[in-house]
Amino acid sequence: FDLGRGSAVKVARQLNAPHETKKIVYCVRLEGADPVKVFSSGPTQEVVSKGDGVAEITVHAVRPGEERRSPDGQSDAPAEADLAPNNLIQSDDPTVVAMARQAAGEVNDPWQVAVALEQLVNQRMTTEGISAVFATAAEVARSLTGDCTEHAVLLAALARAREIPARVAIGLVYYRGEFLYHMWTEVFIGDLWVPLDATLGRGGIGAAHLKITGSNLEGAAPQAAFLPVTEVIGQLEIEILDVE
């Protein structure tokens, strides 16, 4: 899922340590659509309308055990499909299963396992020789090459292989003065979906990821998961208002 720099969203304010941030407040402007309907809202990201095509988005960095609730009070408990293998996230593939056992093999704590899997993907994978084709988790486990999409689906598959519900998140991430379209992983720990990014391998993320949508990729062609993103490309402005 590499759209290139041509689709990047530039911002005026620089972030010196984006992935160490605890909270960031953004103002987003979207031409021709309502950002409240486009950007995901939940315990880690609150989206509030500020008028026609404008919204304020507050993103919180979270870790398991923190008390956070969705602004609308709705539950986001994992579905069966968040734990089951499918055509893109083959958590029952022998290579995926074997790889999942290589990290934190004797550990039972789900968060420790998830972080170890994130680090495993980060350390094993390379971006050399990647193609524009969306690879499945089974293919990535064998090639160990790919961009953010391949990192995300492999980590999701490894987590499910260790009985941790997992899905992918699609949105934007800050990088050197601009936001790039990006994919990462979310794992369900305790009663909270916690984001992980295997391209970073930091044991969680800060507040510099803006989530548009999430998907367990069940029965979906890759293009279907990306539709909400394609609708905003070239139409989005982002302003960083406050950083903690």
PLM-predicted stretches and their roles:
Residues 33, 62-66, 173, 192, ...:
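Short, glycine-/Ser/Thr-/acidic-enriched flexible segments
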Residues 48-143:
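Acidic low-complexity segments
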Residues 74-79, 119, 123, 161-164, ...:
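Active-site rim recognition segments
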Residues 2-10, 17, 21, 86-102, ...:
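A short, charged
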Residues 1-71:
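Intrinsically disordered, low-complexity N-terminal segments that are enriched in acidic
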Residues 106-183, 187, 204-207, 220, ...:
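Active-site neighborhood of thiol-dependent amide/isopeptide-bond enzymes
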Residues 88, 94, 145, 177, ...:
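Short capping/connector residues at structural and topological boundaries
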Residues 10-16, 150, 196-201:
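Intrinsically disordered, low-complexity boundary segments flanking structured domains
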